[in-house]
A protein has these predicted regions:
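Bacterial N-terminal signal peptides
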Residues: 10-22
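N-terminal leader/targeting segments and the immediate start of mature chains
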Residues: 24-72, 227-242
Length: 242
C-alpha cells in the first residue's frame, strides 16, 4: 500500500462524511456577535431540516490536502455515497483508485494497484466512537463539537454564513490532531458545499462537493465491496481511544 497513515485517512474521511449528514444543535460562546449568532442559528436550522429529509446521498468530490512543510498541495477526486444508517462508500478515482467502505463499525480500505485490503473496526481505527455514532445518526455533532461563526471571511457562496466546529474533547488521536472544521453550504438547498479539516500540525484537507443527489433509493449492494481472489487481507492497527 502507499505510505499513508490510513487511520488518519479513514478518520478524516469519516468526519467529512458525517459532516455531509449533519445532525446539529446550536452551541456557541457568549462573546460572539449577535448578528453572526442569528445567521449561524438559521444555517443550523436549515441543515437540520435538510438532514431530516435525507435518507441517502451521493456526490462527486474534489479533495485538496495541504501538508505542512510541502509547497504543493495533493489533489484527488472521486465519488461518495452515504446511506443511513451507517453505510458509506468513498471512492477515490483520480489520480489513483482507492476505496473506503464502511458498514456500521466495519471498515475496508482497498487499493487495487497493490492488491491489498485493510480491514478493521471504525471504533479502533478512528480511536473514537464519535465518527461511528455520527454516521449511524446516533449522536449529534454538537455532542462532539462547539458550533460557532467562522471568523475572517465568515461567508460562503450566496452570502451564507460559514460554520466552524471546534472539538470539545482532546482525548484520543482524533481529538489531539483535529483543530477545527469549517462547513460551507449551498444556497437554497443547504447541502454541504465544502468541508475543510484543519489539523493542529498545520495540515489542511479541503473537500468540495458537486452533483449532489439525495433520496435516490441507493441499494445495499452498492455498499458491498467485491474483491478478486488474489487480494491480500491486512488487519488494521488497533488504537487506544475513548
Amino acid at each position: 500500500m502507499k505510505k499513508l497513515n490510513w487511520t488518519c485517512v479513514v478518520g478524516g474521511v469519516l468526519v467529512c462524511a458525517c459532516s455531509l449528514f449533519p445532525l446539529l444543535t446550536f452551541a456557541a460562546g457568549e462573546e460572539t456577535d449577535e448578528k453572526a449568532l442569528k445567521e449561524v442559528r438559521e444555517v443550523v436550522k436549515q441543515l437540520q431540516a435538510r438532514y431530516e429529509k435525507t435518507k441517502d446521498l451521493q456526490a462527486d468530490f474534489t479533495q485538496k490536502t495541504t501538508i505542512e512543510g510541502f509547497e504543493r498541495p495533493i489533489t484527488s477526486s472521486g465519488k461518495v455515497y452515504i446511506k443511513r444508517p451507517g453505510r458509506l462508500r468513498w471512492n477515490y478515482l483520480d489520480p489513483s483508485v482507492e476505496d473506503i467502505y464502511v458498514n456500521r463499525d466495519d471498515v475496508k480500505v482497498y487499493v487495487p494497484e497493490h492488491k491489498q485490503v485493510l480491514v478493521g473496526k471504525l471504533t479502533q481505527m478512528a480511536a473514537s466512537k464519535a465518527p461511528l455514532e455520527l454516521l449511524q445518526g446516533a449522536a449529534k455533532l454538537e455532542e462532539s463539537f462547539d458550533i460557532e461563526p467562522t471568523p475572517g471571511k465568515g461567508h460562503g457562496v450566496g452570502g451564507i454564513r460559514l460554520l466552524t466546529l471546534l472539538p470539545k474533547s482532546r482525548e484520543g488521536e482524533a481529538g489531539r490532531s483535529l483543530q477545527r472544521i469549517v462547513l460551507e453550504v449551498f444556497p437554497k438547498t443547504y447541502f454541504i458545499r465544502t468541508i475543510s479539516l484543519y489539523e493542529v500540525s498545520g495540515n489542511v484537507a479541503s473537500f468540495e462537493f458537486s452533483s449532489l443527489q439525495s433520496n435516490m433509493g441507493l441499494g445495499d449492494t452498492l455498499f458491498d465491496l467485491k474483491l478478486p481472489a488474489d487480494v491480500e487481507v491486512v488487519k488494521a492497527p488497533v488504537l487506544n481511544g475513548p
